[in-house]
């Protein structure tokens, strides 16, 4: 890093934007290259334009958004595409599937505005009666939640489909979800463990059971 970096800037950069995807901690030059090529990939951008962008970033005369600084060009960018670069989305509560989409987008790190006006919620199906979603601590459950964003979203999809479409009860297990505090490589941070997921499903079940038949 350049000597002109303040101590606070160094701490913030190391803590928030310097990635360690391949076993080596990025320095600022590494981050600049990752972000540049993550943004220009597939575009008709000249070497002169890339050099100009590199100059402005190295001298910190111009910066991408913080989300782009962390995510652009990372392995998870290759896997997920540009959705995780967005800060916010807007959805309407006119289908149960939109609640699954909302959770997926939230787990990408953005904010989701969900309109629950009656003109939208009145389009939701009636809640099926006598649906029971049971959490088990074994691998004998009907659905084993995988240790991934996709696994959590699939569980929510199954729960809502049971209450709004099939009326079928089922059990699920979180034995494969990593324990609380373990690192998350793709987006950084640490795992919350399965407890918030179990609590969420329990709360959703309670709300929908109170509305069964309506």
Spans of features found by a protein language model:
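Extended catalytic cores of very large enzyme megasubunits
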Residues: 1-214
């Amino acid at each position: 890093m350049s000597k002109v970096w303040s101590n606070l800037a160094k701490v913030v950069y190391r803590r928030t934007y310097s990635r360690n995807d391949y076993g080596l901690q990025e320095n600022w030059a590494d981050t600049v290259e990752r972000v540049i090529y993550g943004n220009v990939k597939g575009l008709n951008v000249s070497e002169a334009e890339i050099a100009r962008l590199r100059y402005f970033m190295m001298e910190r005369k111009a910066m991408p958004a913080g989300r782009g600084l962390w995510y652009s060009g990372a392995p998870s960018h290759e896997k997920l595409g540009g959705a995780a670069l967005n800060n916010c989305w807007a959805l309407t509560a006119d289908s149960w599937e939109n609640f699954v989409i909302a959770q997926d987008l939230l787990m990408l790190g953005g904010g989701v505005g969900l309109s629950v006006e009656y003109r939208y919620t009145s389009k939701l199906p009636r809640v099926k009666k006598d649906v029971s979603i049971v959490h088990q601590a074994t691998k004998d459950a009907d659905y084993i939640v995988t240790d991934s964003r996709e696994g959590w979203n699939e569980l929510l999809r199954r729960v809502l489909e049971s209450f709004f479409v099939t009326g079928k009860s089922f059990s699920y297990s979180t034995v494969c979800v990593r324990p609380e505090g373990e690192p998350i490589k793709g987006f950084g941070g640490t795992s919350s463990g399965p407890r918030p997921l179990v609590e969420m499903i329990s709360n959703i079940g309670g709300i929908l059971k109170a509305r069964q038949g309506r």
